[in-house]
From Swiss-Prot:
EC number: 2.1.1.-
Coiled-coil ranges from the UniProt annotation: none
Cell compartment(s), UniProt: Cytoplasm
PANTHER family membership: S-ADENOSYL-L-METHIONINE-DEPENDENT METHYLTRANSFERASES SUPERFAMILY PROTEIN (PTHR31760:SF0)
Name the record gives this protein: Ribosomal RNA small subunit methyltransferase G
Residues the entry annotates as binding S-adenosyl-L-methionine: G69, A119, E120, R136
Keywords: Cytoplasm, Methyltransferase, rRNA processing, S-adenosyl-L-methionine, Transferase
Protein role: Specifically methylates the N7 position of a guanine in 16S rRNA.
InterPro entries noted in UniProt: rRNA_ssu_MeTfrase_G (IPR003682), SAM-dependent_MTases_sf (IPR029063)
Length: 225
């Protein structure tokens, strides 16, 4: 039994062996990457932090997924290994995208596309086109919403992974939710075996985003919604 499967068993997560083997290979490649994708080098802790954190609160996904600021492929690549989705991973750092290209080839992952771009620079034809938009460790919630909501279909969902201080961000994001036509579906709280408290904030897009969003980076940062 590989290490991912062993740790999944501790959480009661049931996944096909072929998928846990692929995830196990991925985490080995991630923690040994020659570029700075994670500060973690302990495999077991990295599995809790970078794989279980993504998988545990999610039951099933289908359709087209956009992962904003994917870094080393978290959460988008992990979700693409597990679920029948077509994922687009967006990352602005070219060397990270090049590393991800190698990983997709090495692990024979065919349901993932890569875009080297910032979210606010994505072409207009990407707006209102994804069933699911995800992000982890990119920015505070009201900024995340502006970066991500424009690319989600009406009726689609947005998933944001956050730590124990999420409530302050959430309370500050109500104007962003209203402006961008986003409503809360569910807030899933969970604790990793490492003791870390986590939440998955789930939103639904209930109307089209005004055409002027997302704004330029400097405007978003200087005057968040």
């Amino acid at each position: 039994m590989n290490k991912v499967a062993e740790i999944f068993r501790e959480y009661g997560i049931k996944i096909d062996d072929s998928k846990t083997e692929k995830l196990d290979s991925y985490i080995d490649l991630l923690i040994s990457a020659p570029i700075n994708l994670t500060s973690l080098r302990d495999k077991e802790y990295a599995i809790h932090k970078h794989i279980v954190d993504i998988v545990f609160p999610v039951k099933m996904l289908t359709g087209k997924l956009l992962d904003v600021g994917t870094g080393g492929g978290i959460p988008g690549l992990i979700l693409a290994i597990l679920f029948p989705i077509n994922a687009t991973l967006v990352e602005s750092v070219r060397k990270k995208v090049m590393w991800l290209e190698k990983i997709l080839n090495m692990l024979n992952i065919g349901n993932v596309n890569l875009l080297c771009s910032r979210a606010e620079k994505l072409p207009a034809d990407k707006k209102e086109s994804f069933d699911i938009v995800t992000a982890r460790a990119v920015s505070e919630l009201r900024i995340l919403l502006e970066l991500c909501a424009p690319f989600c279909k009406v009726g689609g969902r947005l998933f944001f992974y956050k730590g124990p201080n999420w409530k302050q961000e959430y309370d500050a994001a109500h104007n962003a939710m209203k402006t961008l036509n986003v409503e809360t579906i569910e807030i899933v709280s969970y604790t990793l075996k490492t003791g870390e408290k986590r939440v998955l904030l789930q939103f639904q897009k209930v109307g089209r985003t005004p055409d002027n969003y997302p704004r330029e980076t400097k405007k978003i940062l200087k005057n968040p919604l």
